[in-house]
């Protein structure tokens, strides 16, 4: 006569980390659910912080004139226009006239706020979906303004602007703000739960 045994599984203990989404609220998908390896989550967090520097450094340099790409007398706070000069004289390719027509104080503000907003979102790990759209638009415009498809460019298809856009997509889809960031708490806010595009 054979005996059968019944295996019972204990419910996951939220305090032990067995239920990744439990800490952020029931039904909420977190990075632990999407990226299962801890090392991968940490690598994505490093990439996110590196991406933050890509946006925040030019913002600070153009605002203060730190002497790297922007000399002190060309700082925004010194009265210079961070985007106008480039749009009027630095754009290459067939869209040069279009970009020159866009030059003005409004584009200066949009450019600087874009750098600051996307950089802070990446640094804090919140609002990555909005940041990805804004960052992709900003870097897409920069790609068009440099027109790398012209002869003599380093790479006519994928340059640093395209790589940053791809990085933003990866960081957003892997919920990279949850590790070493405020993404998990941000996602649990009632407003963000009602409007997931804010995540």
Regions found by a protein language model. Give the residues of each.
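Extended, low-polarity transmembrane helix blocks
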Residues: 1-89, 94-117, 124-199
């Amino acid at each position: 006569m054979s005996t059968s045994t019944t295996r019972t599984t204990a419910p996951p203990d939220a305090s032990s980390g067995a239920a990744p989404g439990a800490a952020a609220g029931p039904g909420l998908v977190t990075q632990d659910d999407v990226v299962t390896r801890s090392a991968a989550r940490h690598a994505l967090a490093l990439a996110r912080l590196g991406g933050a520097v890509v946006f925040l450094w030019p913002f600070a340099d153009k605002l203060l004139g730190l002497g790297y790409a922007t000399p002190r007398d060309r700082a925004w706070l010194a009265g210079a226009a961070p985007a106008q000069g480039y749009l009027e004289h630095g754009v290459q390719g067939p869209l040069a006239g279009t970009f020159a027509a866009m030059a003005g104080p409004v584009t200066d503000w949009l450019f600087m706020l874009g750098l600051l907003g996307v950089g802070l979102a990446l640094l804090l790990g919140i609002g990555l979906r909005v940041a990805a759209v804004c960052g992709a638009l900003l870097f897409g415009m920069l790609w068009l303004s440099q027109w790398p498809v012209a002869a003599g460019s380093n790479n006519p298809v994928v340059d640093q602007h395209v790589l940053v856009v791809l990085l933003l997509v990866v960081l957003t889809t892997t919920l990279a703000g949850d590790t070493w960031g405020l993404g998990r708490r941000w996602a649990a806010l009632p407003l963000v739960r009602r409007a997931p595009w804010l995540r």
